[in-house]
C-alpha cells in the first residue's frame, strides 16, 4: 500500500484528501468529533510540508440531493477551531465555488469541499458515470490521499475512482488502521480473544466465519447473543431473535468446539418488560441466561457475566471488540458494555494489544467516559473494520496498492 512518503515533495502541490467526517449531529452541533480529530495528523503533516490541502467528505445520506441540514458547515467550523486556522467551505464539490476557493489557496491552506454525497454520481452503481464525475474532482488536485477509513469498503467516486486519476496514497489514519487491524488478525499474540456484540448476528456472520479458526476465544453479548442462547435450547422470552440464523449459529457452536475455540456466553442477563422507549420507566431484573421469563426482554449481560467477560478479556494478549453488550444508551443497561471496555483497558495496561472496532463500540467507549489512550487502537470505521475482520478485499485499499 502506498503511503504519504511515496508522493514525494508536496510543497505547493494541491492535495485532495478524502477524509471521514461523518459525525453525529444534533441540529448543527457535533456530538462526537472523534472522526475529525482522527484526520488531524494527516492534515497537519500535509500543511507542514507546504501542500494546499483540499478536503472532501460525506455526511449522512442525502441520496444525491442538496440537503442543507447535511452541509459540512459545522465540520468546517470545528476543523478551524482544532487547527487554529480558517477552513473555508466551498458551496459545491467541484463546481465554480470549489474551483475559485482552490485557486485562491496559499501553501499550507486548508479548504473543505461540500458534502460529496450531494452529487448523485458519488454513489452511482454505474462505473462510467462515477469515473466521469471523479475526473471533475481530480481536476482540482495534483495528488490524492485516502484517509477516510470509514469508507474504504465502498467503491465510490471520491475514494475509489479519484485514485485512478491522480498519484494516490494512504493517509496516516488509513495506514494506522490497516497496521492495527492486520497486527490483530494476521499474526496475533495469543491468547487472541474476539468480543462481539450489537443487535444482529446477521451483521457479524462474516467476522465469526473468518475468525473462528484464528481466535482462541469468542466472547458473545449484545442482542445477537439471544440467537446463540436459543440455539443452545434456552428460551429467550421477547428478546431479539433471528430465527433464520439458528441453524448457522448451531454450526458455529459445533465448529468452535471442534476447533478448540472457547465460546463464552453470558450466564445471566438483565431483562425488562420491553425495549426502553421515551420516558417509560424501566424495571431491570437479573435472571439466569437459561431462565428468561416468557414476557421479558434481555437488554444487557448480568453482573456474573460482566465479571466473567472482564476476566476472560484480561487473560488475553490480543483483543478485538466490536459491538456493545447491551442498550448502553440507557444507564440501567450499560454495565455490560462498561465491564467489557474496562476489561480492554485493564488488559492494555498489562501489555495486551487491544482494538475497539468502529461504530457503536467506539461511541460507547467515548460516551461512557473511557480515556481513548486506554486502548491500543480505536477504529474509526464501522463497516470498514468489520469487512477487514471478515478478511474481505476492500476496494478503497486495493486502489492504493
Swiss-Prot record:
Compartment(s): Cytoplasm
Pfam families: PGK (PF00162)
EC number, as in UniProt: 2.7.2.3
Gene3D superfamilies assigned to the protein according to its UniProt record, in alphabetical order: Phosphoglycerate kinase, N-terminal domain
ATP-binding found in the keyword field: yes
One biological process term in Gene Ontology: gluconeogenesis
PROSITE patterns to which the protein is assigned, alphabetical: PGLYCERATE_KINASE (PS00111)
SUBUNIT field: Monomer.
The protein's name in its UniProt record: Phosphoglycerate kinase
Biological source species: Bifidobacterium longum (strain NCC 2705)
